[in-house]
Curated annotation (Swiss-Prot):
Domain annotation Tyr recombinase: ranges: 106-285
Protein name as annotated: Tyrosine recombinase XerC
Main location (coarse class): cytoplasm
Protein encoded by which gene: xerC
Similarity comment text for this entry: Belongs to the 'phage' integrase family. XerC subfamily.
PROSITE patterns: CB, TYR_RECOMBINASE
InterPro entries in alphabetical order: CB (IPR044068), DNA_brk_join_enz (IPR011010), Integrase-like_cat_sf (IPR013762), Integrase_catalytic (IPR002104), Integrase_recombinase_N (IPR010998), Integrase_SAM-like_N (IPR004107), Recomb_XerC (IPR011931), Tyrosine_recombinase_XerC/XerD (IPR023009)
Start and end residues of each Core-binding (CB) domain: 1-85
Keyword Lipid metabolism in annotation: no
Subcellular location: Cytoplasm
Catalytic residue positions: R146, K170, H237, R240, H263, Y272
Signal peptide start and end residues: none
Length: 299
């Protein structure tokens, strides 16, 4: 089983050209299946049956594995069996028709508008790191980029005169997004100092040494800003969630938010309507005369 897993991973890496992160996640999931098979005395991939795979999924769920993680595990198994069937090494797929247990969908964490403005209006020193980090925060909140999209930006992708940025999203799909005035100003200030360090390098966000800033480094800079300005944990996706939530709250245009986020399915975007409803419910509870309860009626 291990040998066939190695062959499949090589196929994903060399022919499918999946990202290193995805490859590592799939390998870990499939190694769990191999461990389960070894413990159950299942001799190979061709011997694994749907009842046994269902047992593994149930066991993982019982031990706290999320529905999302189990869906990824089943996706990894299906991908492996497609490969094995194509190579003539197997003739079935035990994951076919098998779904993970349904779990509660967690609402994304966001900053409210006041906290977002507190983060961005905290004041900026006129130096390389401060100007770069401010531009990163402004662009995340202005345009709702994913971490990988922002890290992969090149200078040619930005049109500050027109207030536009072109990003390459999931599945290699390109989209053009508006960039707000404050973000454009922050980027212009950053470019004033950036050009001194790497005038010929194409990456938008770079280190002092002129190298492209990694996704990990961007995560750490955002975390540092959150702790310093807000006293809380902050990550890039929280800024993306805040962008989506605040835009939907103001515009009520779900389709437009879907396009800007680069979601293939509008159901993914609809989770932000639940956040908007939470906000409306809080306003109602605090403001509507028939929603307020007197202290004497709280029993």
């Amino acid at each position: 089983m291990e040998r066939q897993l190695e062959a499949y991973c090589a196929h994903l890496r060399n022919e499918r050209q999946v990202s290193g992160h995805t490859l590592l996640a799939y390998r870990r999931d499939l190694e769990k299946v191999i461990e389960f098979c070894n413990n159950q005395g299942i001799a190979g991939w061709d011997a694994l049956q749907v009842q046994q795979l269902r047992q593994l999924v149930a066991r993982q769920h019982h031990h706290g594995q999320s529905s999302r993680s189990l869906a990824r595990l089943l996706s990894a198994v299906r991908g492996l069996y497609r490969y094995l069937n194509r190579e003539g090494l197997c003739q079935h797929d035990p994951a076919n028709g098998l779904a993970p247990p349904k779990g509660e969908r967690r609402l994304p964490k966001t900053l409210d508008t006041d906290r977002a403005l507190q983060l961005l209006d905290g004041g900026v020193d006129d130096d390389f790191i401060a100007r770069r980090d401010q531009a990163i925060l402004e662009l995340f909140y202005s345009s709702g980029l994913r971490l990988s999209e922002l890290a992969g930006l090149d200078l040619e992708h930005l049109d500050l005169t027109g207030g536009l940025v072109q990003v390459l999203g999931k599945g290699g799909k390109s989209r053009v997004l508006p960039v707000g005035r404050k973000a454009c100003e922050a980027l212009q200030e950053w470019f004033r100092l950036r050009g001194i360090a790497a005038p010929r390098d194409g990456a938008v966000f770079i280190t002092r040494q002129g190298n492209r800033l990694s996704t990990r480094a961007i995560q750490m800079r955002v975390k540092t800003f959150g702790e310093r300005e807000l006293g809380q944990h902050l990550h890039p996706h929280m800024l993306r969630h805040s962008f989506a939530s605040h835009l939907l709250e103001s515009s009520q245009d779900l389709r437009a938010v879907q396009e800007m986020l680069g979601h293939a399915d509008i159901s993914t975007t609809q989770i932000y309507t639940h956040l908007d409803f939470q906000h409306l419910a809080a306003v109602y509870d605090s403001a509507h005369p028939r929603a307020k309860r007197s202290k004497g009626n709280e029993s």
